[in-house]
Amino acid sequence: MPDLKRAIGLMSGTSMDGIDIALLATDGENWIERRASASMDYSDGFRARLKAGLVDARAIKDRAERPGLLRQLEHDLTLLHAVAVHDFLHEQGLQPHQIDVIGFHGQTVLHRPNESLTVQIGDGALLARETGIPVVYDMRAEDMRHGGQGAPLIPAYHAALAANLPLGLKGPVVFVNIGGISNLTYVGEDGALIAYDSGPGNMLIDQWMELHGHGRFDPGGATAMSGSVDRNTAHRYLEHEFFKGNHRRSLDRGDFAIPAKGELNLADGARTLAFVSAAAILKSASHLPARPRTYVVSGGGRKNGALMDELTALAEREGAHVIDADNAGFDGDAMEAEAWAYLAVRSLCGLPLTYPSTTGCDKPVSGGVPVRP
């Protein structure tokens, strides 16, 4: 058996709803033993502070800057992650010395790939001190220094998972993660690896529900299921410059905006935005070298019934099959956190986190900043 490291991955995504935690044992290459996972929701108050921090982040010109609320927010965010780790270890009956490394994503507050600028708040050194566990953080920056988009980083993990797909799933396979922003990873039958952000995921739907005072998201897609797609609005989204041309890029929260209040009713708006999220995946997949036969879907968006219905219908028109990651033997909620654990081990081993075909970097690039308690 190869030398395995126990790693915890911590992910706080663009939906800003909480922290996903996952434990795995891996050699950073092909051997992956997926263990436990959990999540910790942010309070409404802290979520509001994060959203306010996004406004302050617009002033950042250098990635070390922390204007306005961001310095204190970074400190408090890190302490919440430390609490999440302590609680998780207690639940699993583990001690800090039994964990080799934490992969710490932090919270993205600004992502401008065209300016080679990406900012994830989160103090890796503080997290290491608070948990007593070595930490690898800031994993996107090195990719940008080599001309990459800084995202997506999960494809290296998807490639390892692709080697263990259930029998009967036909390739080429695309792993789709539907978070606030959706991204896809194409694994060709020849092992080719291609990845990029595919468009808005839950982000617009969540914002639409909040705009109307109906909570933070559309549980199960129930609101969308009672509405109809407004084709003119959907067409406007899908004609966005992001989808044009062959050059793929990563997205920031500000690249797409919700319709004005009153432009659509609540249900039709939710259904239209669910359709847009699904259609964006298929539209982005049209840039791949071969049409996918299977889409393996993870992330919170797979729990939106309307979005999944639209995605399934669109994929079936192209002869493709859509499957929930849970039904493919994976954990659709924990996959990103698992990826961050896996990437932390790869970082410690000096292995690439990104490739020219996944982020546009000029060569395979490792990355991450390691810190000890």
Curated annotation (Swiss-Prot):
Catalysed conversion reaction: 1,6-anhydro-N-acetyl-beta-muramate + ATP + H2O = N-acetyl-D-muramate 6-phosphate + ADP + H(+)
Keywords: ATP-binding, Carbohydrate metabolism, Kinase, Nucleotide-binding, Transferase
Binding-site residues for ATP, renumbered to this chain: G13, T14, S15, M16, D17, G18, I19, D20
Residues annotated as signal peptide: none
Function: Catalyzes the specific phosphorylation of 1,6-anhydro-N-acetylmuramic acid (anhMurNAc) with the simultaneous cleavage of the 1,6-anhydro ring, generating MurNAc-6-P. Is required for the utilization of anhMurNAc either imported from the medium or derived from its own cell wall murein, and thus plays a role in cell wall recycling.
Entry protein name: Anhydro-N-acetylmuramic acid kinase
Source organism, top-level taxon: Bacteria
Its EC number(s): 2.7.1.170
Organism: Brucella suis (strain ATCC 23445 / NCTC 10510)
Family the UniProt entry places it in: Belongs to the anhydro-N-acetylmuramic acid kinase family.
One record GO biological process: peptidoglycan turnover
Source taxonomy: Bacteria, Pseudomonadati, Pseudomonadota, Alphaproteobacteria, Hyphomicrobiales
